[in-house]
């Protein structure tokens, strides 16, 4: 399988839950608010024998009318229209921002479009992909609302024929396993992709950074920090025994471990 990290840059985040861009060459973490965390925001593209997958969708930033996630894919030689599956660990704003985009003025509103016509309408950002979302995670997003979720970016998911709502654990097309973990948020899920003798693991925000896998770290920002820590330890041990390839969404230095791709 081919793994392509789609980095959107490094950021600091504090109790305000605002993502502030951070230049690792110039900026000083000590100059940021007390308690600020340094994180990467890094969706992934995985090319398998069956699919072109996108795992989580970043912050949804645009430059010159082009979604950053789309530009990163284009830079890697992949057309956004070629993506066949979008796997969502959860719907927090730093993971789900690129699910949809503002529809260009004057365009035709398709089945995945919400909000009428014109510049205010939104459409799913991958027109030919199936989106895989835990049903209860979407419901929870609307219950919880800001500041962790931006529900207007999620409205497209509600009635689109492109969306497959998942209820609990299961397997997609015989080779993508998914499991609800909770821990970071109540309906967070993780994925194992098994193809061609390889096993890739994407742990979303329960397993966001390499260093957290190696320590008994309990995060205050997690819904159940103790469970998250225990899951990381379990996955780290099993992953080494079974030669998993780990994808780390928030790791500034090590997006893929081991880095053999």
Can you describe what each PLM-predicted range is?
Residues 8-10, 57-60, 91, 136-137, ...:
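Active-site metal-binding loops of divalent metal-dependent hydrolases
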Residues 67, 74, 83-94, 108-180, 186-259:
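Metallo-beta-lactamase
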Residues 80-83, 127-129:
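Short acidic capping loops at alpha-helix termini that bridge into adjacent secondary structure
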Residues 53-55, 87, 131, 200-202, ...:
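Residue-level marker for buried hydrophobic side chains located in beta-strands
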Residues 2-8, 42-47, 53, 168-196:
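Core dinuclear metal-dependent hydrolase active-site scaffold
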Residues 1-50, 234:
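Zn-dependent metallo-beta-lactamase
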